[in-house]
Design a protein with these regions (language model features):
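Helical-face signature of the major facilitator-like transporter fold
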Residues: 11, 15, 19, 141, ...
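Selective transmembrane alpha-helices of multi-pass membrane proteins
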Residues: 97-127, 185-196, 207-240
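Flexible interhelical linker loops that connect adjacent transmembrane helices
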Residues: 125-144, 205
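Hydrophobic/aromatic residues within the transmembrane alpha-helices of Major Facilitator Superfamily
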Residues: 12, 16, 20, 117, ...
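Selected transmembrane alpha-helices and immediately adjacent juxtamembrane segments
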Residues: 20, 139-161
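Alpha-helical transmembrane segments and their membrane-interface junctions
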Residues: 158-170, 230-238
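Alpha-helical transmembrane segments and their lipid-water interface positions
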Residues: 25-26, 79-90, 112-116, 155-156, ...
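Juxtamembrane transmembrane-helix termini in multi-pass membrane transport proteins
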Residues: 2-102, 162-180
């Protein structure tokens, strides 16, 4: 911890332990990766737009799927850069107030429930062979990374406690220490969520229409559960 390499390494390990725990960002990463494995247009595979089995994902779809995790981490990381700066400027104590944690939980929980509801509504029409001509619009992974991070009150609390402590230690080495801390932390997210997307891409041949809908449904259930839990925790913090 007395060198920039030590700070980066320990920051990576602590960040990885947190990233590996189930949460909204993991759920969105799985859902977005699966969605991006769908062929952009079934006509490219020689079938009609409504053909339920136009063929396996092509190289472009595999690449899009593999990039889902890194793009979500990009959105997550952009938000964390802003938060690191804010914490350094004194926002840490504000984030520990019950009223702030409470409102983050209530609003964040509502956002997660809304995202889950949208996933539930889309289940009936989901298909790996869906054509781009249907005009389906999806949330960009970078935006999804930002929204899911903002919706999690425990993310803000982590930065106001563990993150604040790490920042204080890092600043003993000046700007270099702070940069080392952030790089180690964000690389842990990139390593884990990138690995999740890559594993889904490598196993894409097992992703049938039925399995895809089941995966999206499971993600929606988890998001809905997280939303209710965050909302409940937020209300408890507000009435405490």
């Amino acid at each position: 911890m007395e060198t920039t390499i030590g700070i980066a390494l320990t920051s990576f390990l602590v960040g990885l332990s947190g990233a590996m725990m189930p949460g909204p960002v993991l759920t969105i990463t799985i859902g977005e990766t699966a969605a991006r494995l769908r062929p952009v247009g079934s006509i490219r595979h020689g079938g009609n737009p409504g053909d339920p089995s136009p063929g396996p994902p092509g190289g472009a779809q595999l690449l899009r799927g593999a990039l889902a995790g890194p793009l979500i981490v990009l959105g997550h990381g952009i938000l964390e850069v802003c938060l690191v700066v804010a914490v350094v400027l004194g926002l840490g104590q504000l984030l520990l107030r019950d009223s702030v944690v409470g409102w983050i939980g209530v609003v964040g929980g509502a956002v997660l429930v809304w995202m889950a509801w949208g996933m539930f509504r889309s289940l009936r029409g989901l298909s790996l062979g869906a054509a781009a001509g249907r005009g389906e619009r999806r949330r960009h992974p970078v935006l999804a990374g930002i929204l899911t991070s903002l919706a999690n009150p425990y993310w803000a609390v982590w930065w106001a406690t563990i993150g604040l402590g790490y920042i204080a230690l890092s600043l003993k080495l000046g700007t270099a220490g702070l940069v080392a801390f952030y790089c180690g932390h964000i690389l842990s997210d990139l390593a884990w969520y990138g690995a999740i997307s890559l594993s889904l891409v490598l196993g894409h041949r097992l992703l049938t229409d039925r399995a895809y809908r089941g995966l999206v449904a499971a993600c929606a259930v988890f998001l809905f559960g997280f939303g209710l839990y965050f909302g409940y925790a937020g209300v408890r913090a507000l009435v405490a």
